[in-house]
Amino acid sequence: MTEDLHLDRDALVAAIMTFLANQDHLDEIRASIEAEIDSAGQEALADLNRRLVATGADWTYYERDPLARRLHQRLADRILLSGSTLVGVDHLAAIVGKPVVIVANHLSYSDANLVEVLLSRAGAAGRSVSDRLTVIAGPKVYSSLKRLFSSLCFGTIKTPQSSAVSSENAVMNAREVARAARQSIDAAHERLFRGDALLVFAEGTRSRSREMQQTLTAVTRYFDFPDVWVLPAGIIGTEEMFPIGEDGLHPVRAIATIGPPIEARALHDDAGGDRRRMMDIVGAKIAELLPADYRGAYS
């Protein structure tokens, strides 16, 4: 982001309210946001501004911002309708204290925020994952103030999108893309070493039909870490929260379902070391967590 960016209290509130132009009770929402910012204080606002300027400049890890996280959780109180929940919380007990890569389908720019909020609401086991969540994010996440602000609710690692799903890397030659991808993977392994839980969207891009697309083979590179576990997750509902082609948020009932964790070593053995086969197994595990009309390539 530009080094000239600076949002004071009123400018930050105004920017957040643009997400919500089609909501009811705007005065109540504004008051809730203002109270959260005032409670955090000027130093927290200054920290947020510093992170907005610095985040996304290179292919590396960026830390979360506590104020951005709290503000999004207040917004979630208004956006997520009754029935929005995390299913399969019991599976989280198996990954406590272990390196884990959560692999999910992808419907919306709001998917990672949904996962973070639902985990934070899911008792001690959920909070333990939410508090160490780091999301693998493509360049578009850092391309606008709105998306960048949303990305500060958790750690992120900027990564180039696969050439199979993106034209964004056209200005980079193949060697540059490979170097950037290597930096991102190294950063991810460092975060796993430090105890983070990685969240990766297996298809590499949002589905425009809500049906699953074939997963990307390159995702297996995140599994190349000692004793790592793979946790499949299925998301529904967010395609209506932040529809493709629209800027505003819509209230929705959204659900994330967690499946049984898979030891990456066992996944590798089951696939005979074939990385494409590994990701098709993971894709099928995600599809099992989704309604039939979301399964697409893994029906």
For each feature predicted by the language model, list its residue ranges.
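Membrane-anchoring hydrophobic helices of lipid-metabolizing enzymes
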Residues: 1-101, 106-124, 128-130, 141, ...
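A conditional alpha-helix N-cap/helix-loop micro-motif detector
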Residues: 82-85, 177-182, 212-213
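Short, glycine/acidic-rich beta->alpha junctions
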Residues: 107, 111, 180, 211-217
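Short internal beta-strands
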Residues: 134-139
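A contiguous catalytic/ligand-binding core that recognizes phosphate-bearing ligands
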Residues: 143-146, 176-189
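Surface-exposed cleft-lining segments at the edges of enzyme active sites
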Residues: 165-180, 208-209
